[in-house]
Amino acid sequence: MRNKKFPFSDAPNTACFTCCHVLEKNKPILYVSHDEDGYWQFLCGGNHKEEDARVVSLASILNIDETMGDLAELDYGECAEAESTTSDWIVSRMNK
């Protein structure tokens, strides 16, 4: 991460969820959600089992992909999806 101001309103050490595919298999992050309860999820967009979940800090996510800072303004209950790393993000409200 560069010496830019931290883009999220949450602290850099805020716990968030990712998947083993992003963390251990270097898959790109293609699904991001800012859940109603305040939790962030940064996932590969694939199918997941409970054992695929990993907990990391927001700062760690930015170290994996600094472009995630572009989604720091997602409101509670919003998600963003992309088809690939070169696609535009499509932001929508999550279904309750």
Each model region followed by its residue ranges:
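Acidic, proline/glycine-rich low-complexity IDRs
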Residues: 1-96
